[in-house]
Amino acid sequence: MDMKFYKCSHCGNIIAYVNASGVKASCCGEEMTEIVPKTADSSTEKHVPVVKVDGNLVTVTVGSTLHPMEEKHSIQWISLQTEQGNQRKALAPGQEPTAVFALAPGDKVVAAYEYCNLHGLWKA
């Protein structure tokens, strides 16, 4: 099952459901909006995560050409969905748009997500 992310249109909070019970997510007194990840990238700045697995280590890099990591335009986080759960790494301007995750024995990658402060949610 794909992860689902929701964003508050007032304060910008973003949540991901661990277990969706059917109750709508709300924030600031209103229902949150589901963020549908993009999967194709035609812009000059690449957003689609690139996933490389080496044994139990998974490296996720944002873009086949590295995404900028400036104050005004950067990747805020990278999330890895696996068969056994998910992991998230926060990023900051000035860092490389890359995160390394460790898989538990027998676990496998399902999807990788990243969130750009200007262009939203992306998935590979």
Model-derived regions: residue spans:
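Cysteine-rich micro-motifs
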Residues: 21-31
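Exposed aromatic-hydrophobic patches
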Residues: 61-62, 98-105
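Short cysteine-rich clusters marking metal-coordination/redox-active sites
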Residues: 8-11, 27, 116
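Short amphipathic, basic-aromatic surface patches that mediate peripheral association
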Residues: 62-70
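Cys/His-rich microdomains that often coordinate metals
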Residues: 15, 31-32, 120
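Residues immediately within or flanking Cys/His clusters that coordinate Zn2+
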Residues: 5, 24, 113
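Short acidic/polar inter-strand loop motif in beta-rich domains
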Residues: 115-124
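Short Cys/His-rich "knuckle" micro-motifs
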Residues: 17-21, 35-38, 124
